[in-house]
């Protein structure tokens, strides 16, 4: 009987995880460390990154915390130099930095002409807010890949971008975020083609609804009761619940395992409890 290919051994690998201080990406960092990789936890918040690195070290793993602004070429180049010096050349890049901004959202789900001037509509979107969201998701992914993937070319590497089910089915109220994540998915496919002959695979994970520090206030009120938005989300999610961060790691590890997914590149994989498959009828 042939040996199963799904043996996740990342010993000797160096992994860089951006947004590593957050709920989802800290789970990614801990998972790859558990499989033997040396991990650079990058975050704009040094303390958040250090907390994750310390937790990895407490479990016997090897990790460093690196403060980095994924929208600054200078900051990223400095971070890349630090990772190279302290851990070695990266083999894995997880582009997890991203997010939304209130100035890129509307108050209404559909336009009521009578409400113009009464609530924040499409016509009130702040261009700087929209641009910030596009930068934070799309440009951060592009710039971070430029900083860390150059030395992968020719020696092999694995890039995992974090998209969203918004990229498949845009949600109401958040046009900037939905558009930005669609751009990340498109960039993932473009990079997969571009890097294919250089031995670098590029894929993306598209999470559905997971409770994070960024969206908690939108999903629950101050008493911890689910908001109306949460009720609508769960009705549209066939599994009827939010995902847990650990439920993303199986897909992550499959994509990182060359024996199991070595012919997989350019994919955007939803992990969303069926949200993107549900028509609502």
Model-identified regions with their sequence ranges:
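Substrate-binding pocket helix/loop in short-chain dehydrogenase/reductase
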Residues: 104-131, 233
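Active-site helix of classical SDR
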Residues: 145, 180
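Short, small/polar-rich loop/turn modules that mediate ligand/substrate recognition or access, typified
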Residues: 156, 196, 201, 263-265
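Active-site loop-to-helix junction immediately N-terminal to the catalytic Tyr of the SDR YXXXK motif
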Residues: 170-178, 187-192, 218
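C-terminal substrate-recognition "lid" of short-chain dehydrogenase/reductases
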Residues: 241-271, 276
């Amino acid at each position: 009987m042939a040996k199963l290919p799904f043996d996740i051994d990342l010993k000797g690998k160096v992994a860089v995880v951006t947004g590593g201080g957050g709920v989802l990406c800290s789970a990614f960092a801990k998972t790859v460390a558990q499989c033997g990789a040396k991990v650079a936890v990058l975050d704009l918040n040094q303390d958040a990154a250090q907390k994750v690195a310390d937790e990895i070290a407490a479990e016997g793993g090897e990790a460093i915390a690196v403060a980095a602004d994924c929208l600054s070429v200078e900051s990223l180049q400095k971070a890349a130099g630090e990772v190279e010096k302290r851990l070695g050349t990266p083999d894995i890049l997880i582009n997890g930095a991203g997010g939304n901004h209130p100035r890129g959202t509307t108050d209404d789900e559909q336009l009521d002409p009578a409400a113009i001037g009464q609530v924040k509509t499409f016509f009130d979107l702040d261009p700087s807010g929209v641009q910030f969201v596009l930068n934070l998701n799309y440009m951060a992914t592009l710039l971070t890949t430029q900083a860390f993937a150059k030395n992968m070319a020719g020696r092999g590497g694995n890039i995992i971008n974090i998209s969203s089910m918004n990229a498949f089915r845009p949600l109401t109220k958040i046009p900037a975020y939905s558009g930005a994540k669609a751009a990340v998915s498109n960039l993932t496919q473009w990079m997969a083609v571009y890097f294919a002959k250089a031995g670098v695979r590029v894929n993306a994970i598209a999470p559905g609804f997971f409770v994070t520090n960024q969206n908690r206030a939108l999903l629950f009120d101050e008493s911890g009761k689910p908001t109306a938005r949460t009720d609508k989300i769960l009705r549209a999610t066939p599994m009827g619940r939010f995902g847990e961060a650990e439920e993303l790691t199986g897909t992550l590890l499959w994509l990182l395992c060359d024996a199991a997914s070595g012919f997989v590149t350019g994919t955007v994989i939803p992990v969303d409890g069926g949200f993107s498959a549900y028509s609502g009828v």
